[in-house]
A protein has these predicted regions:
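Conserved acetyl-CoA-binding loop-helix of GNAT-fold acetyltransferases
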Residues: 52-63
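N-terminal first-folded block
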Residues: 2-44
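C-terminal structural segments of small proteins and small subunits
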Residues: 66-101
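Short capping/connector residues at structural and topological boundaries
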Residues: 15, 51, 96-100
Length: 101
């Protein structure tokens, strides 16, 4: 289902530990693992048929907004999410800090 601005709806599927977009019989996902007060983001997957529509960006934004609402720190393992965070410094406060050595 598309919104008024043409974006597809992102749904939170906590039973599967992911955010998802369902379109054209396909599913794009951003998986997460909640570990205490941290949200580990290991994988984003967008089917080839859905690429080029900004769906990965929508998934990243929804996931990071949810992490902020929940007061979680983010551990971005997924290269796509890491690149998204570099392009969107407004989420820098969500990143975990390195442990002191």
């Amino acid at each position: 289902m598309a919104g008024n601005d043409g974006t597809l709806a992102v749904v939170h599927e906590p039973e599967h530990s992911r955010f998802a977009v369902h379109a054209e019989g396909r599913t794009a996902v951003l998986d997460y693992q909640r570990v205490g007060e941290r949200l580990v983001l290991p994988h984003t997957g967008v089917p080839r048929e859905l690429e080029g529509r900004g769906i990965g960006n929508q998934l990243a934004k929804a996931t990071l907004d949810w992490a902020r609402e929940e007061g979680l720190r983010v551990v971005p393992i997924c290269p796509f999410v890491r690149a998204y965070l570099q392009r969107h410094p407004e989420y820098a406060d969500l990143l975990t800090r390195a442990e002191p050595s």
